[in-house]
Amino acid sequence: MTNPSVPINRSPWLPDLLWICLLAGVATIPFLTPALDLKLLSLFYHPGAERAWPHEFDSFWRFLYTFGPWPALLTALTALGVLVAALSKPALARWRRHAALIFLTMALGPGLFVNTLFKDHWGRPRPRQVTELGGTMTYQCFYEKGIAGRGKSFPCGHSSMGYYFVVFYFLARRRHRGLAIAALAGTALYGTLIGVARMAAGAHFASDVLWSAFFPCVIAWGLYYFVLRIPQAEDNPEQGAGSAILKSRWLVWIAPPLAVAMLAAILFGTPAFAEIKHDMKSPAGTPALRIDVHQCRITLKANPDLQDRILITGEAQGFGWPWSRIRHSALWTRTNEAWVLNFTCKPKGHFSELDGEVTIQMPPGTRVEQTAQTN
């Protein structure tokens, strides 16, 4: 029986589709040319400064970068737990569809579409990688597909974990309109703050952030209205316990590996950072230099003001397991001909992404014996 307190709407999904289309337009039209994306990123970029992206190290942005995705992950795992517990606890049966919406939006939105299908394969260079912002790659608009794996800017995975909370707008919209609007506003604020944190680090463009909102919104919309059919289930409580799939005992076997996979995906995306600074005075004479650097761009500069010193500055950053580290060292060794500075910068552990920039200033005439790089 239809609940008389809920107004009848033959196309209840249409208003939500309209604002999602508006979101897509805002994420698209202003960014059809590079101007706005580059202008917004230039607010955080300071060429010539000791750190080109100094706001990356502001404690507030750093906190959001490191811990921002965790509330979404814990929410999705809790929903998965409710799905499994409902198999043996009748009191939870009425929440099956709601829990499925919360979990599936995470699995399909930030999980499948954002971080797997697009981010790993679209190939858009990050802001700090493009020539206009101090890098070496050509700027690429969000709608231009690049070389898979060469750039992981589009869309922003971190901010998609903030925008994921749009699921609570859908769950509240029919009976708690004010709460739904508050959930939508809070979601927009949280996801955008995480996105700005990534922009401040030179890791994502504004268009990456806005498009990361589109994916969880449209997926939650489709699941809510057409797959899980939650409005119909709420109007017919006797059918609201869920479909046969949601009642299946297979969930007991599927849930643990799903939970482990989601947790592993988040852990494998743990940020790692290393600030590189070595001011090395040569024991005697004009030194030589041996370089062994992985996944970093190297710039060599002859500096007449450095007669007996080698100055190494830069930074490296990436994503990997929590125990993965970026190790670097600079040590003098004596050969038959001269003193040699051995500079190394290598990852320890496994990384899903690693990038960095190193500038080496040295006296004119310094012999570079070896340069090993992996890009």
Where are the predicted features?
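Alpha-helical transmembrane segments
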Residues: T78-A86, W221-R229, A265-I266
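Short, intrinsically disordered terminal tails adjacent to the first/last structured region
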Residues: M1-S5
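Acidic (Asp/Glu) and glycine-rich low-complexity loops/linkers
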Residues: L267-A288, Q295-N375
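Hydrophobic alpha-helical bundle signature of multipass membrane enzymes
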Residues: V6-G151, S160-L189
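Internal/C-terminal transmembrane anchor helices
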Residues: R96-L112, A244-A272
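Membrane-embedded catalytic cores of phosphoryl/pyrophosphoryl-handling enzymes
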Residues: R10-P15, Q140-R249
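Regular secondary-structure segments
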Residues: L41, L193-A197, T344-C345
